[in-house]
């Protein structure tokens, strides 16, 4: 607004010395934008909110719906009824992309197009700072991780089918048989999202089981290879791609990305990595970099909310710089225009953080992880439990609930002895009974602890038409019940301290509840001494525990 001419005229109203001082302040803010547009990477130091809002408002004024004299007579003219909605979106209502390309420029929305391109560039630079090197252009999509995986798999299949179509005449018979390329080899990770992403793409999921090594679940490379080479189901030509994962719930470790990437290169099949919240871990970023340097990785999908501290709704696809074909295909596969909201959230956050702030967040998360591991280990041992050893997982950790389960079994035996008059009661509290180990998660949640997961062996669940045994553990028969916690981006030492304090109370309260449940159960069965017996048992619990 304040052009040199306007500033000169302003000197007729306010002292020139004051106007000069004010113009220096506005010029400094203008230089922030000049540097951003010239360097096209994260600013060294984060911007203040006023500078960010000023930039967004000016960008919005470059869109046709904010032109002073614009007359829109089309079916889509970015009309917004509510002033509140307009302010929420800074007047940016055209969205991004065009029908043929989600990253294409819009003639009526120069400002929105500029913001979208800058977001992709800043996200790519944030990846670089986090340790993801040799990456091609990043593509921010207004879809959460699961739907982005579905879109990526659809694009992957189209590339695969196009490649099979180029087979020479001597191979045409086998190519025709396998051209559908509908099989997705998936390294098991018990989250419904992954299964539904494959089903949503109309593809066939082939589950490669995990392998238990110590406490940790790792990639069964032999199972992955066998699934790819299965000639009874078409062999490699029938495979759309392999889907591996980096970030996951303990005791599941990150997949052996380098080995899987080498296998995919050797067998000439695609490879998509689910890196949902892996950007926040430097070690996982380094692992992805190593994988696409040494083998085949077609694309990597990651969430915006988990990695950049923004609301749910966006994800980022990136391919290696030497082969960005999959990202290009997804960009051109997206139907119609897209919402700018997830891109705008990421842009605002990254401008606010700057490179220094982003590094500080990454450092703080790693510190929180080590602190949580030490505190959880001590808390677990104080209650007869132990921290699961999962060195291949740099974000999540697990704690056994074995001692708690043994306590419940002891309480059950005592109740059964009263009820039956003998010592044959050995009811398991894993999956039912008066108080179940699985209730421990509800007890934590009721104490305002969110994010923990209690996994009890033996659960069978069907997801997307596939039956999973031991669902939740990513293994058919994980040997112990456990709960998980994660030191994700934004977690502080204060969070960890509060969590461990509430965890200690939950352990004590859970055992008290189990004793009360046993007392009520026995009383309902007509045992007149049940109440006193349960109270005596509670008093002596510390001596008989474990």
Regions found by a protein language model. Give the residues of each.
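Conserved N-terminal alpha-helix of the aminotransferase class I/II PLP-enzyme fold
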Residues: 3-150, 154-159, 365
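Conserved PLP-enzyme active-site core in the AAT-like
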Residues: 14, 118, 122-131, 138-377, ...
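Short, mixed-charge, low-aromatic patches
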Residues: 71-80, 104-111, 182-188, 283, ...
């Amino acid at each position: 607004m304040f052009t040199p001419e306007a500033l000169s005229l302003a000197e007729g109203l306010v002292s020139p010395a004051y106007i000069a001082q004010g113009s220096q302040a506005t010029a400094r803010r203008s230089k922030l934008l000049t540097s951003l547009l010239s360097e096209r990477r994260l600013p060294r130091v984060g911007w203040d909110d006023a500078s960010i809002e000023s930039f967004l408002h000016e960008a919005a004024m470059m869109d046709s719906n904010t032109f002073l004299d614009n007359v829109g007579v089309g079916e889509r003219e970015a009309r917004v009824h509510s002033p509140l909605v307009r302010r929420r979106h800074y007047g940016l209502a055209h969205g991004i992309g065009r029908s043929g390309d989600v990253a294409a420029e819009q003639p009526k929305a120069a400002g929105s197009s500029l913001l979208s391109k800058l977001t992709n560039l800043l996200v790519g630079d944030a990846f670089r700072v986090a340790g993801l090197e040799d990456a091609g252009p990043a593509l921010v999509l207004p879809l959460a991780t699961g739907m982005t995986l579905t879109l990526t798999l659809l694009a992957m299949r189209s590339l695969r089918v196009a490649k099979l179509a180029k087979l020479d005449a001597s191979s045409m018979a086998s190519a025709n048989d396998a051209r559908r390329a509908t099989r997705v080899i998936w390294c098991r990770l018990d989250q419904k999202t992954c299964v539904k992403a494959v089903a949503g793409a109309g593809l066939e999921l082939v589950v490669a089981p995990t392998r238990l090594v110590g406490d940790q679940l790792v990639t069964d490379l032999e199972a992955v290879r066998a699934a790819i080479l299965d000639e009874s189901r078409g062999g490699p030509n029938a495979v759309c791609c392999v889907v591996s994962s980096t970030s996951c719930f303990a005791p599941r470790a990150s997949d052996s990305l380098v080995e899987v990437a080498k296998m995919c290169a050797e067998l000439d099949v695609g490879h998509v990595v689910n890196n949902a919240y892996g950007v926040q871990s430097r070690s996982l970023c380094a692992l992805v970099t190593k994988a696409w340097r040494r083998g085949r990785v077609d694309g990597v999908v990651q969430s915006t909310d988990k990695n950049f501290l923004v609301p749910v709704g966006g994800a980022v696809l990136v391919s290696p710089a030497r082969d960005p074909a999959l990202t290009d295909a997804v960009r051109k596969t997206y139907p119609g225009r897209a919402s700018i909201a997830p891109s705008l959230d990421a842009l605002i956050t990254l401008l606010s953080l700057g490179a220094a702030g982003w590094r500080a967040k990454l450092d703080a998360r790693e510190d929180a992880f080590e602190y949580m591991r030490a505190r959880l280990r001590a808390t677990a041992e104080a209650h007869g439990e132990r921290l699961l050893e999962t060195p291949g997982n740099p974000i999540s950790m697990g704690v056994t609930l074995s001692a708690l389960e043994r306590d419940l079994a002891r309480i059950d035996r005592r109740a059964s002895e009263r009820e039956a008059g003998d010592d044959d009661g050995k009811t398991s509290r894993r999956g039912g009974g008066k108080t179940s180990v699985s209730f421990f998660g509800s007890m934590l949640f009721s104490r305002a602890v969110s994010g923990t997961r209690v996994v009890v062996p033996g659960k069978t669940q069907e997801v997307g038409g596939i039956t999973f045994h031991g669902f939740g553990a990513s293994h058919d028969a994980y040997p112990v019940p456990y709960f998980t916690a994660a030191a994700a981006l934004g977690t502080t030492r204060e969070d960890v301290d509060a969590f461990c304090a509430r965890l200690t109370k939950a352990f004590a309260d859970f055992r008290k509840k189990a004793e009360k449940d046993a007392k009520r159960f026995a009383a309902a069965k007509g045992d007149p001494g049940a109440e006193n017996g349960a109270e005596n048992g509670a008093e002596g619990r510390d001596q008989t525990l474990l």
